[in-house]
Amino acid sequence: MFRLFLFAMSGALLLAQPIKVEIFEKLNATQLLAPPSDAVPVETYQEPAFAFVRIPTKFSGNALPMDRSTPFGLRATYERILTAGEYRFRLRARGAARLEIDGKSIAEAKPQPPNTTGDDPVPPPPVREDSQLRPAQYPHQDILYRVTLPAGNHKFVLTAVIGGKGLYPTPGELSVSFAQIGQLERLLGPPTAPFLTDDEWDRYVIAVNKKHDAADIVRRRLASVAVAAEWKTRHETIRAELLKTPAPLVPALKSALPVNNDIDRFIGAKMETEAVQPTALTTDLEFLRRLSLDATGVIPTPAEIRAYLADAPKTRRAKAIERVLASSGWADHWVAYWQDVLAENPGILKPDLNNTGPFRWWIHQSFADGIPFDRFVAELLSMEGSAYQGGPAGFAQATLNDAPMAAKAEIVAQAFLGQKMGCARCHDAPFHPFKQKDLFSLAAMMQGKDLKLPKTSTVPMIEGGRKPAVVVALKPGQAIGPEWPFATLINHSESGQLPNQAEVPSRNEVAALIISPNNKRFPQVIVNRIWKRYLGVGFVEPADDWSRGKASHPELLDYLSREFVTSGYDVKHVARLIFSSHLYQRKPVADPATSTGAKGRLFTGPIRRNMTAEQLVDSLHLGTGRAYECEDMNLNPSGDRSPNQFLNLGKPARAWQMTALSNERDRPALALPIAQSIVDVMSVFGWRQSRQNAATSRDDAPSPMQTLILANGIMGTRMVRLSDDSELTELALADMPLDKMMTEMFLRVLSRPPAAEELRVMSNLLGDLYPQRRVKGAKKVDATMKSDNRVSWSNHLSAEATVIRMEEERTLRLGAKPTTRLEPRFRERLEDALWAMVNSPEFVMVP
């Protein structure tokens, strides 16, 4: 029974129920438009109005994102009391849909045909019936119907077919709006439903997406309750057994080296042996900036800085650690790391070498939900869920690869066991202890059956030619059976059972062997990865190739590995220990070269680091107060092609959501100019556009190009432009003294107040114009750039599509239109000051 809502409109009291929405699957298109009476919906939920831009994510029993049937259907039902009169109803739908009023069909939309061409004409621009009404977006059908309704209660039913063969399974801008003749249309719903205008539609879409984000979190966590309880029981058993064994002995220090926790005691013991001293402690604000970047991927906001400084000095660092560990940014920042390590490589164009599905969304939800890391590995290796909507099944893909599971075996061994097997792909590895058979036997376990060695994965043998310098033991076409190749780490017989069983039993075996409590290597590798991420260098280097390195602090590695396991494989627990240590809180070591080699890694302080590409881009947006403006990561906006051809990765809100733009052929119509300006910066700072292979470390050494692109590039220029969509424009217009405004700007960008000399320089630069900085009568204008969604792969060969994209790029190069609300000379000087702050080494370096 739905709760009744009361609304007052035109002096009359009207009753309205919420919109009930049902999702149906495994029916044909005809049945989906008129579901049989015995059809049972797989999902029932509510929406605030008749605009359906997003469908709830479908989750499996262990909370993996799943695909819905092809096609699936939506039915929305609503009742409302209306006054008598003539009404205009408008149905907008990309595909087949039907609107009924009181049991009578009044409007029907036709099915959307799939598209296979690339030389369609560009459709005409949307037509506005008047200056306010939002036009229908291509390829939506816009169907109008006039009807005279008597006063009283009326029932509205919308049914729609979503997706289908060759189509993308999203609803587009499916909506119903209405109004009495002569009035502006609102979305069908309560009297307070949004008007069908651009501004109100945009606000509605943002609100609905937030609502679905929150609902998806609740639903997937509820779906995961039973499985989570089984994992908890497993962890309690492992913990009880491990606590029966002696813990590593924590050394006692002879000197007065600073100590916050046991990490400092282990580190200090070696420092005493080598007679070296630690670096000094960071200031409170240096620590907060480093902590925020390392834990959440962005610099702290002024509000966070003030909350931090409001805490008592003795407890503020500990409280800050707990705040960042509880932040939503924790999940965002880990995604980018595992995208590299697991070679997540989705493409928004047609498949290229080693493209995967976008399992980034599952990585994010795993860290957001705080699932234990051993469960993370098990779910990854199950390779189940949706391949194109964000599930681990996307990891199984390696397009255009002759042996996809061999590629995945390389990644898994390297990521979780520190075993680099890449050289064993085509022959026995000459410098690693692996044979080609080892790699393919692990691949066969992940495949769930024997694998035949592809001819293209062998070294060609030319009759009478020179004998290869490598050993080629396998022949093309030879079958290799499933077999565990790492008996030196753990015997196959020790695999055990896991709470959630994969559909392919041998994949379950691989996961069980990797995360077994008897496999000491797994927790050591993960702890080493976490340590390297926060301190700049690992106990073992390279972190992904343990056959080449020895641990610099084996006892501390064992100690942290034990902590990791007894905590229930909780990454946050290890992070908390590291963040709380005096070592992490020290000033960085100036010269990384002094810390190379196991003997030289004394950890007198963290290694000096620059921001990662993702940290830089996200912090630039946050620090300069700009929204993440970018096109959708989608070259199929009309939705008339299937996900296995063209992915829709949505509109990015963080840098990890970017992807390769796949326009190597330099077709201007396929360009996404704003996204390209962001990708250009990220690439120069070490981000990999194409992750065809796994990587733990990036090629991100400082270079002149980094300085040049930040100082002169499109994105850097756009960030410092004071336009009407910049928060810093509002700051400059606020009623406050100049020194307070500059303090706020320094806090935003550099996470500290300005020094006295900096304030003097800023006062000399801006002081004479500051009192007259506001322009009377100037109005705020919409400065956001918008992409023309008429351009897609389907028409990218047309000259008009090229002209549209080239004009968008030209506009982008000109930059956002400066605000007219600030006096031009003052605005330009303030932009110069902001440019200097953003381009200072202090901004890019992690304290």
Predicted regions: what they are:
Residues 8, 14-16:
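Boundary at the C-terminal end of the N-terminal hydrophobic targeting segment
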